A protein has these predicted regions:
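A short, hydrophobic C-terminal helix/tail in secreted or cell-surface proteins
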Residues: 179-184
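Conserved "landmark" site that anchors the functional core of diverse proteins
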Residues: 1-178
């Protein structure tokens, strides 16, 4: 029960919000680069706020699902496809055993996120599942994902009420316009 990484992409790692409190000992916080997209990915699946996801940069991975789960894809537009057909972003997607998830190059943004309702089974190191490549800790063996890696799920497919209606309008998450309120 999990995912097989057929192609690792340019830089695909397991990330959460990172580990804090260890900087004085030489460990960086690590964690996701785009907190907003990360939180939306988990929110769509009713996951805990800090549940680990796959974060990929510029070129996404190719994943084979070895069991059923529900996923969400957020971040930049990487033109995701499931079994060769376009997949929607910012929505809950039911994945069947044997499904193949692929990505094109980044059309917008530089990072993408895949959250899993079954949770990735990677160890907690110093309070986080985030990959720290420099220190070679966390995530999957402390490194980026490579072809033929396999990550199991921690839980069987969770029931997700109304998953078909769990989506977010892409215009609502546009990064092209940002209004910051100020006090004069």
């Amino acid at each position: 029960m999990g995912i097989r990484i057929l192609k690792g992409g340019m830089m695909t790692t397991v990330q959460d919000l990172g580990r804090t409190g260890y900087q004085s000992q030489g460990f960086s916080v690590s964690g996701v680069m785009d907190v907003r997209s990360f939180k939306i990915a988990n929110l769509l699946l009713d996951n805990p706020e800090n549940e680990a996801v796959l974060e990929f940069t510029l070129i996404g991975p190719t994943l084979e699902f070895t069991s059923e789960t529900i996923i969400s894809i957020t971040g930049g537009d990487f033109r995701p496809q499931i079994n060769g057909k376009p997949a929607k972003m910012y929505t809950a997607i039911y994945m069947h055993r044997g499904d193949i998830l692929t990505f094109g190059g980044a059309r917008t943004g530089t990072r993408g996120y895949i959250a899993f309702s079954s949770y990735l089974d990677v160890p907690v190191v110093m309070g986080s599942r985030s990959t720290n490549i420099k220190c070679q800790i966390g995530g999957y063996k402390g490194r980026k994902l490579e072809d033929e890696d396999y990550i199991a799920f921690r839980a069987k497919r969770r029931y997700l009420p109304y998953y078909l209606s769990r989506s977010l309008d892409l215009d609502a998450v546009s990064y092209t316009h940002l209004t910051l309120p100020t006090i004069a």
